Amino acid sequence: AQRLLPQSWERFSKEYAGHRKGLELAKHLYSGLLGTDQEETARVAKAWDSWSAAVVMFSMNSEPAGGMMGDLQTAISRARIEMHYAVNSYFIEENHILNHISQFPSVPTHIIHGGRDITCLPEAGWQLHKAIVGSTFKVLRTGGHLSGEKELTDALIRATDNLAEMLA
């Protein structure tokens, strides 16, 4: 994401990322969010909110001016939850689903992925599609990460309607 959004990444990384990456960065941010210094907690939450908004809204026509924050307490809560998952590797081992796909039931599966999703790259959806016999895979060229984006919402509704017809 930082290669596609260099300006947003630079604003974020100047103060918070530095040379930290991945888990090390998540732990650094998490400690700032859980510390007793309320001003530092607010700064970390605002910075994370702006960066994550730029990433998840990459497919939109413009970057949100100040992130998705809303009120400060919401931004702090959201950042704490996101960092809690990040420092715990999202409570799932790498490739867990693909490595255990044989244990999943055989059910109709439609995989819909935003082509401009830089949070979860379309390659992951493709790998899942190849592992699930009979699945369908659709990349929405201008779709991003958020299911609330019109193109993604419409495709999800069509897929759900299709499943309802198949199972009726």
Predicted regions, residues:
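Active-site-adjacent alpha-helix of alpha/beta-hydrolase-fold enzymes
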Residues: 122-136
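Short, conserved loop/helix-junction motifs that constitute active-site signature segments
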Residues: 102-106, 131-132
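Alpha-helical elements of Rossmann-like donor-binding domains used by nucleotide-donor carbohydrate transfer enzymes
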Residues: 28, 47, 81, 127, ...
